[in-house]
UniProtKB/Swiss-Prot annotation:
Gene source species: Xenopus laevis
Compositionally biased tracts (Low complexity): 337-354
The keyword Metal-binding appears for this protein: no
Family indicated by similarity: Belongs to the protein kinase superfamily. Ser/Thr protein kinase family. CK2 subfamily.
Name of the gene: csnk2a1
Assigned keywords, A-Z: ATP-binding, Kinase, Nucleotide-binding, Nucleus, Serine/threonine-protein kinase, Transferase, Wnt signaling pathway
Active-site annotation: 156 (proton acceptor)
This protein's record includes keyword S-adenosyl-L-methionine: no
Protein name as annotated: Casein kinase II subunit alpha
Subunit details: Tetramer composed of an alpha chain, an alpha' and two beta chains.
Length: 392
């Protein structure tokens, strides 16, 4: 049997082909290290698979920052994250990498980021209005269209990686640890993204995917927000994940997708997939979520959650969808800004990387900036005494 049919991104296909090699050749990247003594850790914010995250103070200017201390992984992966963050620095709603230092204790790299006053997404998502959802989805799309236009796929879009400072209506797309450069025809690792947000291409082991993977993940986020069902596709493992998707999108379109790309399905699916009809999106509407759902929301969702990655809306196409007309109208009226002028303060992250367990924040830590504890000598490797209650 011949292999799978190749696929190419519909947009930004050759971005990296036309860039100089040092733009995407992250393995050859030479990291410029900052001074770790500039930062004092205040409290632990959380931990994930690949890192531990702290709130810290930059003692040279007294500004709050977030420090992500990377766990020992391949140097290549660390360089990739750094190169991507440097390439994207200054882009709309992309978390700003402020510095790179070495943790003096572990000798592992630590990434220093702007600070985001984040609201826990599980609490926040339950309070958002229809307009809020449109607004924040549009802000995520700005970040995605930008990174895609720069030849980069995020590959881990999920609520944990979207920091929202709701008070200032500020959003940042964070955790670029799984992000990768797109090269047409390249086969990528399918062990990316988090289960509930994995696109069908990953679940059927199709490796020649592209930016459109991020659009599926965004669709999962949208569905969970408008239907108030978190997560929307709740699989117990990667195989069950595809079954959950098939129970909504139907098995007929799944088999069309498999046939189109000549994909060989894992035999484990034979006993679990069954036959399912395509469900109408309206069936997920009920009295508790109907105020968040509109015909244009369902049309938009339908154009994101497609098996065939080539038929999903691109980020730019998504921004032009009628669902966002009220947002576009307001932003053009306000000159493209999403808030009053003068509020360009940097955005605290409660979850600076994938799968992190959030740590409760003691209220006493609210205004540590001027406290004597901070001015005590506290280098990057040693959390301050006042923060002891915030560590796990």
């Amino acid at each position: 049997m011949s292999g799978p049919v190749p696929s190419r991104a519909r947009v930004y296909t050759d971005v990296n082909t036309h860039r100089p090699r040092d733009y995407w050749d992250y393995e050859s990247h030479v990291v410029e290290w900052g001074n770790q003594d500039d930062y004092q850790l205040v409290r632990k914010l959380g931990r994930g698979k690949y890192s531990e995250v702290f709130e810290a103070i930059n003692i040279t200017n007294n500004e709050k920052v977030v420090v992500k201390i990377l766990k020992p992984v391949k140097k290549k992966k660390i360089k990739r994250e750094i190169k991507i963050l440097e390439n994207l620095r200054g882009g709309p709603n992309i978390i700003t990498l402020a510095d790179i230092v070495k943790d003096p204790v572990s000798r592992t790299p630590a990434l220093v980021f702007e600070h985001v006053n984040n609201t826990d997404f599980k609490q926040l998502y339950q309070t958002l209005t229809d307009y809020d959802i449109r607004f924040y989805m549009y802000e995520i799309l700005k970040a995605l269209d930008y990174c895609h236009s720069m030849g980069i796929m995020h590959r881990d879009v999920k609520p944990h990686n979207v920091m929202i400072d709701h008070e200032h209506r500020k959003l940042r797309l964070i955790d670029w640890g799984l992000a990768e450069f797109y090269h047409p025809g390249q086969e990528y690792n399918v062990r990316v993204a988090s289960r509930y947000f994995k696109g069908p291409e990953l679940l059927v082991d199709y490796q020649m995917y592209d930016y459109s993977l991020d659009m599926w993940s965004l669709g999962c986020m949208l569905a969970s927000m408008i239907f108030r069902k978190e997560p929307f596709f709740h699989g117990h493992d990667n195989y069950d994940q595809l079954v959950r998707i098939a129970k909504v999108l139907g098995t007929e379109d799944l088999y069309d997708y498999i046939d189109k790309y000549n994909i060989e399905l894992d035999p484990r699916f034979n006993d679990i997939l069954g036959r399912h009809s395509r469900k109408r999106w309206e069936r997920f509407v009920h009295s508790e979520n109907q105020h968040l759902v509109s015909p244009e929301a369902l049309d938009f969702l339908d154009k994101l959650l497609r098996y065939d990655h080539q038929t999903r809306l691109t980020a730019r196409e998504a921004m032009d969808h009628p669902y966002f007309y009220p947002i576009v109208k307001d932003q053009s009226r306000m000159g493209g800004s999403n808030m009053p002028s003068g509020s360009s303060t940097p955005v605290s992250s409660a979850s600076m990387m994938s799968g992190i367990s959030t740590v409760p924040t003691p209220s006493a830590l609210g205004s540590l900036a001027g406290s004597p504890v901070i001015s005590a000598t506290n280098t990057l490797g040693t959390p301050v005494a006042a923060a002891a209650g915030a560590t796990q």
